[in-house]
Amino acid sequence: VLRVPGDSGTSDGHRYLVVDYKTNWLGESDRPLTAADYDRGRLAEAMLHSDYPLQALLYSVVLHRFLRWRQPGYRPDAHLGGVLYLFLRGMCGPDTPLADGHPAGVFSWRPPAALVVDLSDLLDGQQVAA
């Protein structure tokens, strides 16, 4: 989990990100890997193929529960900053190319805070409004 500067809408001025790294090989087996093998489209395919969005959502629930317990003035919509999946084989340090402002090898998603809260409640056995 990373604590990063947030907006002024939080009591401590920070938001929190779940970060996970992956070493998946997304290129062709008959040629060397390049950062182009880790563009947004391929990352989305890899995420879906491996059910990483579900993993990200569950990690977000865990973070939500921790912050609810430990963060004074906790507000899910302000404090939950989303998830980053770092596909290390596609990242090239400062030379990592950008496509539409997104670095190769980095998948980001900010699940709606209401989804995280509702899933937490559901997993806790509570009724969730339809």
Task: Give the ranges of each region predicted by the language model.
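Structural signature of nuclease core domains in nucleic-acid processing machines
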Residues: 1-130
